[in-house]
């Protein structure tokens, strides 16, 4: 996908990985970058606008846990303004296994609902033009961090949803791929709660291992966007971008 002159919606594009990815996207010159986030960050939005004045950067407050109909209303506002949207990035995520319901609501249900909502505007069965979805999942969808099983399971669920959804492209006209960062130096991983307190030092232990910066992750994210491979399972780890070959152990046969 060519980012230049495109219209992109980025859910949670003002966080750690999100903000550095937004910077890299803006450098590539989209026509519009629409940021949907729970918390406003005027300084970051001003920075992004100044980085490339030819890009229109817009912010709308959005919590991915709202009912599906509210998401549809917000997207209608955006589509009424832009007319077309080329790419939806679902990037909302929390890491706190003390908050079981919210972890599932943000990391999994929010991704499903935002994707479902945009189908009203993209699905070719409804006369839509199609589009592209990039879902930020996690390497924990491959192998869990067992001390945070709720987080790991929520990301595995988001990955499974994405791998199923991309197979529907022939029916819907909408393609999809997953972005799976490894341990990245963000606020998210500096301090978080393990499930039932099974490992109070889990954040500290993780950070003893090699990590990557949000800039490295953002740069590789843009490479994945440009590659635009339907069904790709991208691993963004240690400053590298690698396509994962999924091992098939079972097939529904339908």
Curated annotation (Swiss-Prot):
The active site is at residue 151. GO terms for cellular component: cytoplasm. It is an enzyme of class 1 (oxidoreductase). Disulfide bonds: none annotated. The keyword NAD applies. SUPFAM superfamilies: NAD(P)-binding Rossmann-fold domains (SSF51735). GO terms for molecular function: alcohol dehydrogenase (NAD+) activity. It catalyses: a primary alcohol + NAD(+) = an aldehyde + NADH + H(+); a secondary alcohol + NAD(+) = a ketone + NADH + H(+). GO terms for biological process: alcohol metabolic process. Substrate binds at residue 138. It comes from the Eukaryota. Transmembrane segments: none annotated. Gene3D superfamilies: NAD(P)-binding Rossmann-like Domain (3.40.50.720). Keywords: NAD, Oxidoreductase. Homodimer. Belongs to the short-chain dehydrogenases/reductases (SDR) family. This is Alcohol dehydrogenase. The lineage of its organism: Eukaryota, Metazoa, Ecdysozoa, Arthropoda, Hexapoda.
């Amino acid at each position: 996908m060519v980012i230049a002159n495109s219209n992109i919606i980025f859910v949670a594009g003002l966080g750690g990985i999100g903000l550095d990815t937004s910077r890299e996207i803006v450098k590539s010159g989209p026509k519009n970058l629409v940021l949907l986030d729970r918390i406003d960050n005027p300084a970051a939005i001003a920075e992004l606008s100044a980085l490339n004045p030819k890009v229109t950067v817009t912010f709308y407050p959005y919590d991915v846990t709202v009912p599906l109909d509210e998401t549809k209303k917000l997207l209608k506002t955006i589509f009424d303004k832009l007319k077309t949207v080329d790419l939806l990035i679902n990037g909302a995520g929390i890491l706190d296994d003390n908050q079981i319901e919210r972890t599932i609501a943000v990391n999994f249900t929010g991704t499903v609902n935002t994707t479902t909502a945009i189908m009203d505007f993209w699905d070719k069965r409804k006369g839509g033009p199609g589009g592209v979805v990039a879902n930020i999942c996690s390497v924990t969808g491959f192998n869990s961090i067992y001390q945070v099983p709720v987080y790991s399971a929520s990301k595995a669920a988001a990955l499974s949803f994405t791998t199923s959804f991309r197979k529907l492209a022939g029916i819907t006209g909408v393609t999809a791929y997953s972005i799976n960062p490894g341990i990245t130096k963000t606020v998210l991983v500096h301090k978080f709660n393990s499930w039932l307190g099974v490992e109070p030092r889990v954040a500290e232990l993780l950070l003893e291992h090699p990590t990557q910066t949000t800039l490295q992750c953002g740069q590789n994210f843009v490479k994945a966007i440009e590659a635009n491979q339907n069904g790709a399972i991208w691993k963004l780890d240690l400053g590298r971008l690698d396509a994962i070959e999924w091992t098939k152990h079972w097939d529904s046969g339908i």
